[in-house]
Regions:
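SDR active-site strand-loop-helix element
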Residues: 5, 27, 58-62, 99-105
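Catalytic phosphate/metal-binding cores of nucleic-acid and nucleotide-processing enzymes, i.e., regions
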Residues: 14, 18, 29-32, 76-78, ...
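NAD(P)H-binding glycine-rich loop region in Rossmannoid oxidoreductase-like domains
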Residues: 41-80
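NAD(P)-cofactor binding segment of oxidoreductase domains
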Residues: 72-100
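Rossmann-fold cofactor-recognition segment
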Residues: 29-45
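N-terminal Rossmann NAD(P)H-binding glycine-rich loop of SDR-like oxidoreductase domains
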Residues: 1-21
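Catalytic helix-loop patch of NAD(P)-dependent Rossmann-fold dehydrogenases
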Residues: 79, 83-84, 107-130
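Short, polar loop motifs at secondary-structure junctions
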Residues: 7-10, 25-33
Length: 130
């Protein structure tokens, strides 16, 4: 069984629509979507949810990626994008659950025609990335 977290965003919605895998459980923090569980990892506990379904892998699309939403609600964006993402990833590693984590492109400054190197430090547009 695979858990797909964050299916209310663009990439998660696309993934859900076109995934050929049959054993997926989809979750969204914000809204109840068709074929989805509404599950907010910032409010609910991981362990009971994971025990119930015995997940073998997790695909994580969940984030607040809109720069204005992050700027206007710094506490929630830090909670979702950093604090609970770290807790979830630590939980997955501790329990040997394979995961794929998609991250925001907004970590980089966004200058056109510039090649970014992950090892270097940049000043990000996003408040929680600096």
């Amino acid at each position: 069984m695979n858990l797909i977290i964050g299916t209310s965003g663009k990439i998660g919605t696309y993934y859900q629509k076109f995934s050929k895998l049959k054993n997926n459980i989809y979750t969204s923090r914000k809204i109840k979507l068709k074929n989805n569980f509404k599950f907010d990892f910032t409010k609910n506990k991981f362990l009971p949810f994971f025990k119930k379904f015995n997940f073998k892998s997790v695909v994580l699309f969940s984030s607040i990626s809109d720069p204005m939403q992050c700027k206007n609600n710094t506490i929630l964006s830090k909670k979702v994008n950093i604090t609970y993402t770290k807790k979830l990833l630590n939980f997955l590693m501790k329990n040997n659950i394979y995961f794929i984590f998609f991250s925001s492109e907004y970590i980089y400054p966004g200058k056109k025609n510039k090649i970014y190197i992950e090892k270097l430090n940049y000043v990000s547009k996003m408040i929680y990335a600096n």
